[in-house]
Amino acid sequence: MADITKDQVVEFISNMTVLELSEFITELEEKFGVSAAAPVAAVAAMPGAAGGEAAGGEEQTEFDVILKSAGGNKIAVIKAVRALTGLGLKEAKAKVDEAPAAIKEGVEKAEAEEALKQLEEAGAEAEMK
């Protein structure tokens, strides 16, 4: 194996565009037969499955904003996605085209609510998880 450090791998990945990173993740999922999204969905489903069993359950502190569809005004939604994520035009358009797609991940409730509001004002259908 080559003398590549973890820091070099992290640096390489941090320089990827969102589209390149998405393709990279897909390749890793296919190579290792796993899904990066499955554990998140399983963890999110667990508290609901427990019902009233967990009286001292933890309150969710990190939220994801998911774009479900662009709605009727795709251009406004692309502009909103660019403003929220800092992506370039091409990457933001790709993100909108591949909906449902995560726009914000692991953010605080207030930030997630604001992002959701901006997307909905632009005409998008979005949800907060």
From Swiss-Prot:
A single BP term in Gene Ontology: translation
GO MF annotation terms: mRNA binding; structural constituent of ribosome
Domain of life where this protein originates: Bacteria
Ribosomal protein listed as a keyword: yes
Keywords associated with the record: Ribonucleoprotein, Ribosomal protein
Keyword Plastid listed: no
A UniProt-annotated Pfam family: Ribosomal_L12
GO cellular component: cytosolic large ribosomal subunit
Family: Belongs to the bacterial ribosomal protein bL12 family.
Classification via HAMAP family: Ribosomal_bL12
Assembly notes: Homodimer. Part of the ribosomal stalk of the 50S ribosomal subunit. Forms a multimeric L10(L12)X complex, where L10 forms an elongated spine to which 2 to 4 L12 dimers bind in a sequential fashion. Binds GTP-bound translation factors.
NCBIfam families the record matches: L12
Protein function: Forms part of the ribosomal stalk which helps the ribosome interact with GTP-bound translation factors. Is thus essential for accurate translation.
Protein's UniProt name: Large ribosomal subunit protein bL12
Species: Maridesulfovibrio salexigens (strain ATCC 14822 / DSM 2638 / NCIMB 8403 / VKM B-1763)
Taxonomic placement: Bacteria, Pseudomonadati, Thermodesulfobacteriota, Desulfovibrionia, Desulfovibrionales
